[in-house]
Structure formats: C-alpha cells, structure tokens
C-alpha cells in the first residue's frame, strides 16, 4: 500500500516559523495572528495545488496536459512573498512523488518551472503591490518559465520518456499535428508556447480571485 503524505500537514510544517525567525518573516515583525494565517494559508494553498495537479485537461500531444496547480502557489507568492510560492510548489511535488510515473523527473521539472514562475511574479509584486504589478510580474514569470521549459524538457524530461517510448515515436506524435523534423524544434514550437499559455491562464485567474481571497489569506476582515 502506498502511503501518501498529507498535503495540508506538509505545507503547514514547511511554512511554520522555525527558531527565532520564520522562513518568510521575522517573528518580531509580524503578530501571532498573522503568523497563524500564514501557516494555515500555506497549508490550504498547498493542498489546493496538490488537488489541482490531478485535474488535467488533455492536449493534442497526448503526453502533455494542462493543469492549474501553479495557481495556488502564485496566490501564495502574492499573499505571503515569493519564498512561500516556492514552498507551495515544493509541497505539491513532494506529495505527487507518491504516485509518480515519471521516475521523479516530471516532479523535478514541474518544481523548477513552477518555482521560476512564482518566484519571479512574487519578487516583482513585492516591489510594488498593485494589480498591474501582479499581472506584469505574472506574465514575466510565465515568459521566463516558458524559456526554462525548453532545456528542462530537452535535457531532463524527454530523455526519461525515451526509456518507454522511442524518440522517433515521440517525434511522430508531433508530426501528426504539424511539420517538424526534430524533437528540438517540436519542443520549441509546441511545448514552449504551451507552457507560456499555461502560466498566463494562471495569472488571469489570479487577477480575478486574488482580491476576494485576500482577506482570508492575509487574515484581515473585510471593511
């Protein structure tokens, strides 16, 4: 029997302040009530990210699917800071390791790309906390994530796939959709834009729901 870690508990543990200073902020600077909401918020977002990772929308390339598991991490980066976003990405992928079919390669790639996305967006938003800054940071983060996805897929993910599906067969899936004569070109034409669009969708949804969720995430009552 496979034992799966509890997403909320793991998120709670990683986001919990340790020692005299927490991972994300100093205890001296934040009141206890805020720290409580930080811990609970991280746990809830990590659990949501884990659940969303299992809700996939298939794409024309049958081994690539669209999911929205980066959305909770993006919300966490905006609410609690960029490091929180990375921690939520970490928890999500640690949980998914229990049912991994990619030899942990997929989770590693997902963590790298998701961390680049949320870290970039969170850092930009941290400098100027406006809706425009959040959207700009998210789009820039999605763009960088898309760029990083090229070497990640080419050198990490796809070499693992070749153990189960010949390189020629993988290329054939792409060739059924458009003219391409190499895996390198296929990843550039399909995977990179796909990754960017995936990030932009998360940014668009976050722009719509972050403000209504902000009182809960920040532990503040609506006025």
Predicted features along the sequence, with ranges:
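Ala/Thr-enriched low-complexity intrinsically disordered regions
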Residues: 2, 7-9
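Loop-helix junctions at membrane interfaces
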Residues: 11, 15-223
């Amino acid at each position: 029997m496979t034992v799966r870690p509890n997403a909320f508990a793991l998120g709670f543990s990683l986001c919990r302040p340790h020692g005299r200073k927490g991972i994300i902020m100093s205890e001296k600077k934040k009141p206890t009530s805020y720290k409580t909401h930080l811990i609970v918020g991280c746990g809830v977002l990590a659990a949501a990210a884990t659940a969303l990772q299992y809700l996939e929308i298939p794409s024309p390339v049958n081994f690539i699917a669209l999911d929205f598991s980066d959305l909770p991490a993006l919300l966490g980066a905006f609410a609690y800071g960029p490091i929180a976003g990375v921690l939520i990405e970490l928890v999500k992928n640690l949980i998914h390791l229990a049912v991994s079919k990619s030899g942990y390669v997929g989770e590693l790639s997902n963590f790298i790309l998701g961390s680049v996305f949320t870290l970039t967006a969170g850092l930009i938003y941290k400098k100027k906390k406006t809706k425009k800054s959040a959207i700009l940071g998210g789009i820039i983060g999605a763009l960088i994530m898309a760029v990083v996805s090229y070497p990640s897929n080419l050198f990490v993910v796809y070499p693992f796939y070749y153990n189960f599906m010949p390189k020629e067969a993988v290329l054939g899936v792409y060739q059924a959709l458009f003219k391409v004569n190499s895996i390198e070109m296929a990843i550039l034409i399909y995977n990179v834009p796909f990754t960017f669009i995936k990030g932009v969708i998360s940014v668009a949804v976050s722009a719509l729901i972050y403000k209504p969720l902000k009182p809960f995430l920040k532990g503040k009552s609506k006025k």
